[in-house]
Each structure stands twice: as C-alpha cells, then as structure tokens.
C-alpha cells in the first residue's frame, strides 16, 4: 500500500513536525512498507476463528471493597510546605 508524500506532509503538519524533503520521501517509503506488511493479514483465513482482545485468555480477579481507616489528615499534611485546612497550597500555574 502506497502512502503519498503529500499524506506524510499532512500528518507531519498535524504533528507540528518540520520534515525535509528527504525525510518525507523516506517516511513515505517506510510507512508504505509497513502497511504492505500489515496488509498480509488480509490473506489469513479467519473463518470460524472467534475474535479476541488478548492473545491469551485473561481473567480479572475481583475482590470485595473493604472500608479501612485512612491516615489522619494532619499527619498526611505534616510535610506540606503550605496548607489550608486539609488542602495543600501550591503556586498558581496558569
């Protein structure tokens, strides 16, 4: 599958990348080769194969939630350089 140099330039622009003409040509060839390789999956007979989200079966081991005592807020905030009630005061970043 061929990807045009114009498509590479478009994706580079979306990603805010400045590519040289040589890089555009190189990425066009490389992405085309990758897409050709992935396209080989279309030749595989998948008749009767059940879809899967993992290569091996995965089972989640859930447990019941248990309420536990938490750390005392004064102890948790004891190393905070600046605080107000149970909140840590931080410099404004915006």
Swiss-Prot record:
It comes from the Bacteria. GO terms for biological process: glutaminyl-tRNAGln biosynthesis via transamidation; regulation of translational fidelity; translation. Its EC number is 6.3.5.-. InterPro entries: Asp/Glu-ADT_sf_sub_c, GatC. GO terms for molecular function: asparaginyl-tRNA synthase (glutamine-hydrolyzing) activity; ATP binding; glutaminyl-tRNA synthase (glutamine-hydrolyzing) activity. Pfam families: GatC. Keywords: ATP-binding, Ligase, Nucleotide-binding, Protein biosynthesis. It catalyses: L-glutamyl-tRNA(Gln) + L-glutamine + ATP + H2O = L-glutaminyl-tRNA(Gln) + L-glutamate + ADP + phosphate + H(+); L-aspartyl-tRNA(Asn) + L-glutamine + ATP + H2O = L-asparaginyl-tRNA(Asn) + L-glutamate + ADP + phosphate + 2 H(+). NCBIfam families: gatC. Belongs to the GatC family. Heterotrimer of A, B and C subunits. Allows the formation of correctly charged Asn-tRNA(Asn) or Gln-tRNA(Gln) through the transamidation of misacylated Asp-tRNA(Asn) or Glu-tRNA(Gln) in organisms which lack either or both of asparaginyl-tRNA or glutaminyl-tRNA synthetases. The reaction takes place in the presence of glutamine and ATP through an activated phospho-Asp-tRNA(Asn) or phospho-Glu-tRNA(Gln). This is Aspartyl/glutamyl-tRNA(Asn/Gln) amidotransferase subunit C. The gene is gatC.
């Amino acid at each position: 599958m061929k990807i045009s140099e114009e498509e590479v330039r478009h994706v580079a622009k979306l990603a805010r990348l400045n590519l040289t003409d040589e890089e555009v040509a190189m990425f066009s060839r490389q992405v085309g080769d990758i897409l050709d390789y992935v396209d080989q999956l279309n030749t595989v007979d998948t008749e009767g194969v059940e879809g899967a989200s993992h290569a091996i079966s995965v089972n989640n081991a859930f447990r019941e939630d248990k309420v536990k005592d938490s750390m005392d807020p004064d102890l948790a905030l004891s190393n905070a350089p600046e605080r107000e009630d149970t909140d840590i005061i931080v410099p404004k970043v915006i």
